[in-house]
Amino acid sequence: MSCSCTKRTLQLFIRNVAQVELAASSTSTYPPQRTNFQRFNVPSLPSLHPSHSRAYWSAYSSEPRRDTVEDAPIENQEGPPSATEGHINTTPEKIDDMDDLFMEITPESLDALAAETSSGLANSQSRESKELKQPWQAEKSRKFIDPEETTEETWTQGEPIDIFSKPMKKPRWDKPVESLRFRSIKIDNAVAVPYSPQASTSKRNMVRDDWTPPDRKTWMEQKAALKEKFPEGWKPMKKLSPEAQAGIRALHAQYPEQYSTPALADRFQVSPEAIRRILRTKWVPKPEEEADRERRWFQRGKSVWGRYAELGVKPPKRWREEGIGRGKPEWKKRAAPVLTTSRPGTSEPRRPETISLDDQMEDRIF
């Protein structure tokens, strides 16, 4: 048998030089030993370049086909029947047709292939050089070519297409000239005109002549009127304390007919709307909020009754005890504690400095 490494090397060489896919056939010049084995069908060869195929088949046809002695007595050889022979019926005509599919590579055919390939490459290079030298002639020839008149199309083998590769992105520098020109104009304008915040604000504040503001809602009008009337906020002179508000709710819940809204408003000297809001609310403060509320209410009471005291109004007892108004009388003030060094119960009563008449008489009576 022939060496497989020599066969593989030869196949690779032919594939690279002639760009031909060879079938897996025997390339040895020596006749192989024929045995009873199944012969495989060789796939049809791909279409070759006209110049390459012509040289190849001319070289192949020049070589006489070798008919070995072993080809004739194939049918006469007897051997044990195999499983493959039972399924395949081979005849001498079919065997001859199959022999035509196999090819034998010789040094002469290799030389012919190499010469044809080099001549084809030289012709293509010379054609390209002519087109580069006279581009206007090439363009004219391309323009006047009628596709209906051309009967034969020359086939040129290009680079193999990689179907698994991703499509190439368009490079950045391949941009139309118009877009670059307009872009440069925009950049020049941006550089020429510096940024000014006043210009931007003026554009924002520009109002069309026919623009009319939308209609304002009722609560917006009321809020604007209150802000105009009380610029510092709502600070009434009379406010009900949390205890008074709790009492109003309790009285109205227990006696709704007797303590109605007008009656409560007259009793506490507030507006009926304030009484309605007090009765309507359901808010209950938290312990922390309640403590803060008491502190703020105490400070408010001191400031309010301080102003009343300046006007000559006598404040209530609670606020008088806190020092608002005239304050506490002298007799109600606590005396400072007296510090003594003697023990309690051991000190003798002090005798008055002045001696009365009775005391003098006691000294004289025995």
Curated annotation (Swiss-Prot):
**Organism, scientific name:** Sclerotinia sclerotiorum (strain ATCC 18683 / 1980 / Ss-1) (White mold)
| Keyword Mitochondrion part of the UniProt annotation | yes
User: What Pfam families does this protein's entry cite?
Assistant: Neugrin
Q: What does this protein do?
A: Required for respiratory activity and maintenance and expression of the mitochondrial genome.
- Name of the protein in question: Required for respiratory growth protein 9, mitochondrial
**Which ranges of the sequence are coiled-coil?**
none
Disulfide bridge map: none
Instruction: Give start-end positions of Basic and acidic residues composition bias.
Output: 127-139, 318-333
Q: According to its UniProt record, where is this protein located?
A: Mitochondrion
Q: Which PANTHER family match?
A: NEUGRIN (PTHR13475:SF3)
Q: Does the keyword Ligase apply?
A: no
Where composition is biased (Polar residues), the residues are: 116-126
Feature: transit peptide: 1-40
The portions of this protein that span the membrane are none
Underlying gene: rrg9
Family assignment from sequence similarity: Belongs to the RRG9 family.
